[in-house]
From Swiss-Prot:
Intracellular G-protein coupled receptor for trace amines, which recognizes endogenous amine-containing metabolites such as beta-phenylethylamine (beta-PEA), 3-iodothyronamine (T1AM), isoamylamine (IAA), cadaverine (CAD), cyclohexylamine (CHA), p-tyramine (p-TYR), trimethylamine (TMA), octopamine and tryptamine. Also functions as a receptor for various drugs and psychoactive substances, such as amphetamine and methamphetamine. Unresponsive to classical biogenic amines, such as epinephrine and histamine and only partially activated by dopamine and serotonin. Residues 1-23, 81-95, 161-187, 271-283 are extracellular. The chain crosses the membrane at residues 24-48, 59-80, 96-118, 139-160, 188-210, 247-270, 284-304. Widely distributed throughout the brain. Strongly expressed in the mitral cell layer of the olfactory bulb, piriform cortex, the arcuate, motor, and mesencephalic trigeminal nuclei, lateral reticular and hypoglossal nuclei, cerebellar Purkinje cells, and ventral horn of the spinal cord. Moderately expressed in the frontal, entorhinal, and agranular cortices, the ventral pallidum, thalamus, hippocampus, several hypothalamic nuclei, ambiguus, dorsal raphe, and gigantocellular reticular nuclei. Weakly expressed in the septum, basal ganglia, amygdala, myelencephalon, and spinal cord dorsal horn. Changing residue 287 to A: Reduced activation of Taar1 in response to agonist-binding. This is Trace amine-associated receptor 1. CDD domains: 7tmA_TAAR1 (cd15314). The gene is Taar1. It comes from Mus musculus.
Length: 332
């Protein structure tokens, strides 16, 4: 790998954008990074601190927040410099570490969403056996799979250069020799990345929420019909409405994920078959649109979960440092 800032004949790469545009991009990306760090840190602190939130499902949310926080802490700052400066300043080894960690954390976040959808499916569709099925051991297995599989896949592919099989020269001429550092895929590895990190988990999410929607809708009609018959309208609906609301909330999270990541993964799988015609700047922009997903998840919690808003207030006011604050009631 050559250092782009040291190669005089391609130094124009760094001046394609004016200082005003670069400053605007730095400001926008810094806001995304800040929102990702602050939002997910509050989720981590809240679930760790408040005993009422120590449920199997919330530990899955906790693990996903850690993934998104690490993405904002370890990956986004270097990606910001690479995107704005159109140059990788940190060397070839760190390029591989950055790329593999980026793919690992992005995929891990997606895996967590898939498992969260399965958890909600069990809660809504089989509530009587939910606690027996989804216990802490089950959640730990989900968390382990969500971290380990993306790690093996990402680091194995990048450090063994399996993603470059058959396109090594093209990668050198278009990326490496220009001092760049961005994910680059052959036709085979592009399809594999699309299937592993997007299509399979995304299909699981869509199928599960399709099932949840119709089953929850049917259960709600059945409960309302029963209550009308016995004259108990408005009663005995709280447990079901609580689970249905949780399912809708996580369904919105899945929708946000699909909107954020779908453009990037479509480009990833199509670009090798189109002869690598997608400009690096567009590819970078789509990657940042995917990063935005990690900043939006805590905002979904804040909008839909009253417990998160109460926890947020206590964290910001410093009330978590008071005695017995961990036993505070967040569910009214």
């Amino acid at each position: 790998m050559h250092l782009c800032h040291a190669i005089t004949n391609i130094s124009h790469r760094n001046s394609d954008w004016s200082r005003e545009v670069q400053a605007s991009l730095y400001s926008l990306m810094s806001l995304i990074i800040l929102a990702t760090l602050v939002g997910n840190l509050i989720v981590i602190i809240s679930i760790s601190h408040f005993k009422q939130l120590h449920t199997p499902t919330n530990w899955l949310l906790h693990s996903m927040a850690i993934v998104d926080f690490l993405l904002g802490c370890l990956i986004m700052p270097c990606s910001m410099v690479r995107t704005v400066e159109r140059c990788w300043y940190f060397g070839e080894i760190l390029c591989k570490v950055h790329t593999s960690t980026d793919i690992m954390l992005s995929s891990a976040s997606i895996f967590h969403l898939a498992f969260i959808s399965i958890d909600r499916y069990c809660a809504v569709c089989d509530p009587l056996r939910y606690k027996a099925k989804i216990n802490i051991s089950t959640i730990l297995v989900m968390i382990l799979v969500s971290w380990s599989l993306p790690a093996v896949y990402a680091f194995g592919m990048i450090f063994l250069e399996l993603n470059l099989k058959g396109v090594e020269e093209l990668y050198r001429s278009q990326v490496s020799d220009l001092g760049g550092c961005s994910p680059f895929f052959s036709k085979v590895s592009g399809v594999l990345a699309f299937m592993t990190s997007f299509y399979i988990p995304g299909s699981v999410m869509l199928f599960v929420y399709y099932r949840i929607y119709f089953i929850a809708k049917g259960q709600a009609r059945s409960i309302n019909r029963t209550n009308v018959q016995v004259g108990l309208e408005g009663k005995s609906q709280a447990p079901q409405s609580k689970e249905t609301k949780a399912a809708k909330t996580l369904g919105i999270m899945v929708g946000v994920f699909l909107v954020c990541w779908c453009p990037f993964f479509l480009c990833t799988v199509l670009d090798p078959f189109l002869g690598y015609v997608i400009p690096p700047s567009l590819n970078d922009a789509l990657y940042w649109f995917g990063y935005l997903n990690s900043a939006l998840n805590p905002m979904v919690y804040a909008f839909f979960y009253p417990w998160f808003r109460r926890a947020l207030k206590m964290v910001l006011l410093g009330k978590i440092f008071q005695k017995d604050s961990s036993r505070s009631k967040l569910f009214l």
